[in-house]
Amino acid sequence: MTKGILGKKVGMTQIFTESGEFIPVTVIEATPNVVLQVKTVETDGYAAVQVGFDDKREVLSNKPAKGHVAKANTAPKRFIREFKNIEGLEVGQEITVETFAAGDVVDVTGTSKGKGFQGVIKRHGQSRGPMAHGSRYHRRPGSMGPVAPNRVFKGKNLAGRMGGNRVTIQNLEVVQVVPEKNVILIKGNVPGAKKSLITIKSAVKAGK
């Protein structure tokens, strides 16, 4: 069965195993998520569980939002997301970090850090030209393509805004779960800046 939870990236640290192995980990704070709605094929056309994370002040919420969370007897939420292939949950039920255990393999989704306007070398990994004095080609994007179409094809790798994209890293290992602090430690790094929203769910390709 698929498991999922929403959390907030705290930062990175390091831990040591009993054998002395050094492991870099990312700390994810995941306060209890509340099930706001259970969607079914009969009523909504697809099956999913809608969960809310991070309480929001009521003064910042409109009446439809307040009415929606009232069914789950909880406060308005800043983030609302859906998970598919999750069964056995009811409206108002809480999802805690204890859903996961050390050794679980998960997929982690976040929004990558924004880098601003960048050139093709940093943005797309292209090679630069000779830096010699006689060269007139250093860090330019290069050819725009053949002459015949009289235009530049869509998708051409050019300079532009870099980062700020939805990124998923697959098959990361849960190193430790700390229920009393609502914290999950995940091996390696995960996308996003500190305090950004992180989605953790069971790995799709685990064991493949």
From Swiss-Prot:
Organism: Streptococcus suis (strain 05ZYH33)
PROSITE patterns documented for this protein: RIBOSOMAL_L3
HAMAP family reported in the protein's UniProt record: Ribosomal_uL3_B
Keywords noted in UniProt: Ribonucleoprotein, Ribosomal protein, RNA-binding, rRNA-binding
UniProt region (Disordered), positions on chain: 124-145
The protein's name in its UniProt record: Large ribosomal subunit protein uL3
Top-level taxon of the source organism: Bacteria
InterPro entries (UniProt xref): Ribosomal_uL3 (IPR000597), Ribosomal_uL3_bac/org-type (IPR019927), Ribosomal_uL3_CS (IPR019926), Transl_B-barrel_sf (IPR009000)
Protein family according to the UniProt entry: Belongs to the universal ribosomal protein uL3 family.
Any one annotated GO CC term: cytosolic large ribosomal subunit
Gene that produces this protein: rplC
One GO term (biological process): translation
MF terms in GO: rRNA binding; structural constituent of ribosome
Protein role: One of the primary rRNA binding proteins, it binds directly near the 3'-end of the 23S rRNA, where it nucleates assembly of the 50S subunit.
Quaternary structure and partners: Part of the 50S ribosomal subunit. Forms a cluster with proteins L14 and L19.
